[in-house]
Each structure stands twice: as structure tokens, then as C-alpha cells.
A protein has these predicted regions:
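Hydrophobic transmembrane alpha-helical segments in integral membrane proteins
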Residues: 1-12
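Transmembrane alpha-helical segments in integral membrane proteins
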Residues: 193-209
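Active-site-proximal structural segments of metal-dependent nucleotidyl cyclase/transferase enzymes
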Residues: 225-227
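Cytosolic signal-transmission helices at domain junctions
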Residues: 204-222
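Juxtamembrane segments at transmembrane-helix boundaries
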Residues: 12-28, 41-174, 181, 188-192, ...
């Protein structure tokens, strides 16, 4: 399952990189690729059958990092200023707290809560950016709905997140919990859906920009003739 998820994430990251290379000055796609990169590395780390402190520390940084990059991608897509410094400080402090708890030998759930909350805060920033947009089109609304679903998944999976380091224990939870099976399936749908919607918005924005530029050039060229 982890390998399937990694393959999907890698393909989406490559797609984002291709979009960035093809459509210049579209920083939203490169931030999106960075978010997927964090998610891909996290998936690789979780495929390890042995739970090591290094693996836990890596995931503790990658989870909030992925959501921060996603938030920055949304901000770039909506042409908003970069992520607020206070949010970055809060996310960094929570992530550091998880690392300190790991070094202190805290329980798995207690250790994972700060960095999971950090990721939730970063995701909430992207959700608020979309919610506050006055003129939302159908893609904005769809993306907002997907991000809200992702937020629900993040909160619902907080208690069982440490079990991701133990595939056997996680399989037992999935067999016993219909909710967790639904959440896993939803997570595999929301990520590619959000990426494809954002790429569609980037492409449509570039097309609209080219049309406006062409219309402006046409009006400029016709101006002297009409006068």
C-alpha cells in the first residue's frame, strides 16, 4: 500500500515539475511539488519495518513541512503574500516540541501530537485563504471542499498516527475500524484530486493571462488606425 501511495505521489510531483518547467513564473506548482516531495519521503520512511528515532524525527518534520508547502502553494495560486511569519514560528515551535519529546522518550501518541497539530495549523491557513476569497469559481469551491475533507482526516487520524510505523498494528486497526478504512480511502483520493484541481487552475490562469495580453496588444495596435 505504501509503495502504491509513493508511486502516485511521485507521479503527481513530476507532473507539477513539468507544469513549472512549461509555464514559467508559476511558483504555485513548485511549492506543490515540494509538498508532494515531503509526502513522498514520508511514505518511504514509513515503509521501514523498524521504528527508529531517526525515522520518527524525519516524519515529525516532513508532515508539517508538507502542509506548509501546500499552504504556500495556495497563497501563490491566489496571488496572496507569503505565509505569515507567526504561523511559521508556531509550526516550527510545535515541530521542535515533538523532537524534544522524542529525545525525552515520551510516548508515541504524546510525541506525535505537536507535529500533527502543526500540520493542521498549516493546512488551516490554506483553507482560510480559499474561504476568504470573495469570487470563488467552481474549482475554488471544489478545492475548498477537498481541503476541508483533508482537515477532517488529519484530526480523525491523530490518535492512530503512531501506528503508521507498525504496519501489522495498522492492518489490525483497519480490519476492526470502518472509519479508519474510509479515512485511508479518502486520503488516497483527496491528495491527487487537490493537485489536479490546482494544476487546472494554474493552466487556466495562464491561458486567461495570455488572452488578456493578446487583447491588450490588439487594442494597442488598432488604436492609431481608428484615430
Amino acid at each position: 500500500m505504501h509503495l502504491v501511495v509513493f508511486g502516485l505521489i511521485a507521479a503527481l510531483a513530476i507532473l507539477c515539475a513539468v507544469v513549472y518547467a512549461t509555464l514559467r513564473n508559476q511558483s504555485a506548482s513548485i511549492w506543490l511539488a515540494a509538498a508532494l516531495g515531503c509526502g513522498g519521503i514520508e511514505t518511504v520512511v514509513l515503509t521501514s519495518t523498524v521504528r527508529t528515532d531517526l525515522a520518527v524525527a524525519a516524519v515529525s518534520c516532513l508532515v508539517p513541512g508538507a502542509y506548509l508547502c501546500l499552504s504556500q502553494s495556495i497563497r501563490a495560486l491566489l496571488r496572496l503574500p507569503g505565509t505569515d511569519r507567526r504561523l511559521i514560528i508556531a509550526v516550527s515551535a510545535l515541530t521542535l516540541s515533538s523532537l524534544v519529546l522524542l529525545a525525552a522518550g515520551a510516548g508515541a501518541l504524546l510525541q506525535s501530537l505537536p507535529f500533527q497539530i502543526a500540520g493542521a495549523l498549516a493546512l488551516a491557513d490554506g483553507i482560510l485563504c480559499l474561504y476568504r476569497k470573495r469570487a470563488r469559481d467552481i474549482l475554488d469551491t471544489a478545492l475548498l471542499g477537498i481541503l476541508l475533507t483533508m482537515a477532517f482526516i488529519v484530526f480523525a487520524r491523530m490518535p492512530v498516527f503512531p501506528l503508521l510505523f507498525d504496519p501489522q498494528a495498522m492492518d489490525e486497526v483497519l480490519q476492526q475500524s470502518t472509519l479508519q478504512r474510509w479515512l485511508l480511502g479518502a486520503a488516497m483520493i483527496t491528495t491527487p484530486a487537490s493537485v489536479l484541481i490546482m494544476i487546472a487552475k494554474i493552466v487556466l490562469e495562464v491561458i486567461a493571462s495570455h488572452r488578456e495580453r493578446s487583447a491588450s496588444l490588439d487594442s494597442t495596435e488598432r488604436g492609431p488606425v481608428d484615430s
